[in-house]
Amino acid sequence: MLKFIQNNREGTALLAILTLFALLGIIDRNYFSLQTFTMIFSSAQILILLAIGATLVMLTRNIDVSVGSITGLCAVTVGMALNAGFGLVASCLFALLVGMVAGFFNGILVTWLRIPAIVATLGTLGLYRGLMLLLTGGKWIEGLPADLKSLSTPILFSISPIGWLTMLLILSMAWLLGNTAFGRSFYATGDNLQGARQLGVRTDSIRIFAFSMNGVMAALAGIVFASQIGFIPNQTGNGLEMKAIAACVLGGISLLGGTGTIIGAILGAFLLTQIDSVLVLLRLPAWWNDFIAGLVLLGVLVFDGRLRCAVERNIRQQKYARFTAQAIISDKKPTVSDNNPAASNKKKAAL
């Protein structure tokens, strides 16, 4: 059972989602509908995008806690650009560029300057948040044009253009990691950095690329946030980094690197969003969301650690049991002296 859970984290997350769906369906029979599914998917888009970026970083055995601030900074960037008269495409591209530069800077700190990822991104978390507040003067950005809001307006099968783009990104990144040598380089880098270097993997480039793509995904999440609510508060992105990490760990991405899939992280993000919908259904205050996210993250980390220890213990027991069985068999085998009385008598005479 432990091996099944350890080796099928995506299936376990999917089972949890289906179980939660079933429980909510019992509470509210109107919950089972296409509208409910599309609503949850729309709500999960920001977390899904952040989970995609966090997966790339965590696979390389790093972590980025500045993505919430990058999300807020890029949301402010697109909002200010639009209000300054720039077009929608130019504003979005500018925000994506800002996110990529922010992620690239994180990668430089970790890869070239050898600063631990958690320390480097804690510093840039405050740096990017402060820059966001400097740009806005601590004020909200309102009056965003309708063009931006149209990105989150349902068009086909009740899914918005951003929703279709998100699904395309999921499929593309899943294929990249699972079917290309470049994608497998992320796993090799996180599993054994020195070994990957000896095999010719450009580990520094892989890690910088992971952080840069994480910044791009955070920027895209900021654009989605602005398009969904139509304004940009001065606290945009607060706490999203913890939810992104929780979604990844919940979906089977190891904090030790080299393990997990994009699909698992997406399922984790979907499950966390579904939990938020439960809070709405139960009419609990919104501030419970952060508490639940932290509780889920802590619980999953404890469970993951205990599960990994249990699996490793079982593997050791099986290995030692095989050696013990071989030793017992060798002890029971008759020796040459046991089968040859003459040899036994010579041995006794020698003694």
Curated annotation (Swiss-Prot):
It is a multi-pass membrane protein. InterPro entries: ABC_transp_permease. The chain crosses the membrane at residues 14-34, 39-59, 70-90, 93-113, 115-135, 155-175, 213-233, 252-272, 284-304. Keywords: Cell inner membrane, Cell membrane, Membrane, Transmembrane, Transmembrane helix, Transport. GO terms for molecular function: transmembrane transporter activity. It is found in: Cell inner membrane. One of its GO terms (cellular component) is plasma membrane. Belongs to the binding-protein-dependent transport system permease family. AraH/RbsC subfamily. The complex is composed of two ATP-binding proteins (LsrA), two transmembrane proteins (LsrC and LsrD) and a solute-binding protein (LsrB). Part of the ABC transporter complex LsrABCD involved in autoinducer 2 (AI-2) import. Probably responsible for the translocation of the substrate across the membrane. PANTHER family: ABC TRANSPORTER PERMEASE PROTEIN YPHD-RELATED-RELATED, AUTOINDUCER 2 IMPORT SYSTEM PERMEASE PROTEIN LSRC. This is Autoinducer 2 import system permease protein LsrC. The gene is lsrC.
